[in-house]
Curated annotation (Swiss-Prot):
Name assigned to this protein: ATP synthase epsilon chain
Chain's role: Produces ATP from ADP in the presence of a proton gradient across the membrane.
The UniProt record lists the keyword Cell inner membrane: yes
Gene: atpC
Family: Belongs to the ATPase epsilon chain family.
GO CC terms: plasma membrane; proton-transporting ATP synthase complex
GO molecular function, one term: proton-transporting ATP synthase activity, rotational mechanism
Keyword Cell membrane: yes
Membrane topology: Peripheral membrane protein
Taxonomic classification: Bacteria, Pseudomonadati, Pseudomonadota, Gammaproteobacteria, Enterobacterales
PANTHER family with a match to the protein in the record: ATP SYNTHASE DELTA/EPSILON CHAIN (PTHR13822), ATP SYNTHASE EPSILON CHAIN, CHLOROPLASTIC (PTHR13822:SF10)
Keywords: ATP synthesis, Cell inner membrane, Cell membrane, CF(1), Hydrogen ion transport, Ion transport, Membrane, Transport
């Protein structure tokens, strides 16, 4: 039987996941993180993107995170997300439209374009589309 630890993924709105997992993958402030049983204690910011949860027995779940905090303690990992949305709850058409609009803003020749905000919106839309894609593959 594979080693596991307890994971809680919560947002301001609701608890998204609580249970035993074999590992998770998430994007921290310094890059990609893989958290396995026995990981050293850690507290880090999470960048907007996804969390890949490998549950007990290898089943996978993907959740979009708009950012937040990851805390790793012995046998327990907590993700406090600003916003968390399950892959199956994301709207693909809305994410595609947001991506298109962000790309238009970036390529716009107007001087009043906020590139940082447009880039953040583009990254958010791309991350949501990736979560949708991976969720479909896992089903």
């Amino acid at each position: 039987m594979a080693m596991t630890y307890h994971l809680d993924v919560v947002s301001a709105e609701q608890q998204m996941f609580s249970g035993l997992v074999e590992k998770i993958q998430v994007t921290g402030s310094e890059g990609e993180l893989g958290i396995y049983p026995g990981h050293a204690p850690l507290l880090t910011a999470i960048k907007p993107g996804m969390i890949r949860i490998v549950k007990q027995h290898g089943h996978e779940e993907f959740i979009y995170l708009s950012g937040g905090i990851l805390e790793v303690q012995l046998g327990n990992v907590t993700v406090l997300a600003d916003t968390a949305i399950r892959g199956q709850d994301l709207d693909e058409a809305r994410a595609m439209e947001a991506k298109r609009k962000a790309e238009e803003h970036i390529s716009s020749s107007h001087g009043d374009v906020d590139y940082a905000q447009a880039s953040a919106e583009l990254a958010k839309a791309i991350a949501q589309l990736r979560v949708i894609e991976l969720t479909k593959k896992a089903m």
